[in-house]
């Protein structure tokens, strides 16, 4: 599709405004993420059971996953040295804080986090920066330049499904951490994975039937997306910072993509 604008997230620029979704347990790994990043989008590696191929996964799954996070990022970088590569990390998983910290230390450009609201994501990111800086300082007497590299700020994005959840996460990050998301991912009721909708809400949108193309109420969820954007706009104005909104779910065709851009989505 001609005329598509690049997606700008702070100092990151995606020439293709596409963020590949996180699909766990062996789908969103280095090959897929690297290929997307090499094509100008953002490739995401899923940390969900990422170390399942490690020989000690069943007996030492924490270390197995940590090794796999580092390795998958390294391999993705080999595919797309200058590409934008991040991680999809589910809040609901055990040791969430460890996955966040090692993802940052491995050189992630972004972390997208859902399956629950990532209320402590900024805290864990800051802990990673401090650990990195301390490690570099220990290794180098004159660490000024190295420390600057060590604390490269990773772009943080919550996944939300409603204006209410967007308001909750933005307000909490604002009050507790004096920061806001770098971008926001909106997962609609037609998205795959761990959705933030009750059965009643899915029924309300007509997304719980065997004939979704004919029952889905696009207009109703479009209204919710606009409300989410209004919430984000409030915090953009407060922080004088652009916060792109990226939509996901039920986007299959050229017309679907065009519709999302017309709503105000940037990816």
Labelled PLM ranges:
Residues 1-239:
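Active-site entrance/lid segments in N-terminal catalytic domains of soluble metabolic enzymes
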Residues 191, 251-254:
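Short, catalytically relevant binding-site loops at active-site mouths
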Residues 225, 254-257:
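A general structural signal for well-ordered alpha-helical packing
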Residues 243-252:
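Glycine-rich beta-strand-to-loop/alpha-helix junction loops that act as flexible
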Residues 257-267:
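A compact, surface-exposed functional segment
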């Amino acid at each position: 599709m001609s005329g598509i604008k690049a997606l700008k997230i702070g100092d990151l620029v995606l020439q293709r405004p596409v963020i590949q979704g996180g699909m766990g347990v062996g789908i969103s790994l280095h090959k897929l993420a690297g290929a997307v990043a090499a094509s100008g989008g953002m490739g995401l590696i899923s940390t969900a059971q990422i170390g399942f191929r490690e020989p000690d996964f069943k007996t030492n799954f924490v270390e197995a996953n940590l090794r796999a996070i580092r390795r998958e990022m390294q391999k993705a970088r080999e595919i797309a040295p200058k590409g934008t590569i991040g991680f999809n990390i589910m809040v609901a998983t055990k040791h969430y804080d460890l996955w966040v910290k090692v993802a940052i230390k491995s050189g992630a450009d972004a972390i997208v986090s859902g399956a629950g609201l990532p209320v402590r994501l900024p805290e864990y990111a800051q802990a990673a920066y401090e650990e990195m800086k301390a490690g570099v300082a220990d290794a180098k007497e004159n660490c000024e330049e190295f420390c600057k590299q060590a604390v490269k700020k990773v772009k943080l994005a919550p996944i939300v499904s409603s204006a209410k959840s967007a308001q909750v996460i933005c307000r909490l990050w604002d009050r507790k951490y004096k920061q806001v998301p770098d971008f926001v991912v909106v997962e609609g009721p037609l998205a795959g994975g761990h959705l933030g909708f009750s059965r009643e809400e899915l029924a309300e949108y007509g997304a719980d039937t065997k004939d979704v193309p004919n029952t889905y109420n696009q207009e109703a969820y479009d209204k919710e997306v606009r409300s989410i954007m209004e919430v984000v706009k409030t915090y953009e104005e407060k922080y004088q910072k652009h916060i792109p909104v990226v939509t996901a779910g039920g986007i299959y065709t050229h017309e679907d993509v065009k519709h999302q851009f017309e709503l105000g989505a940037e990816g």
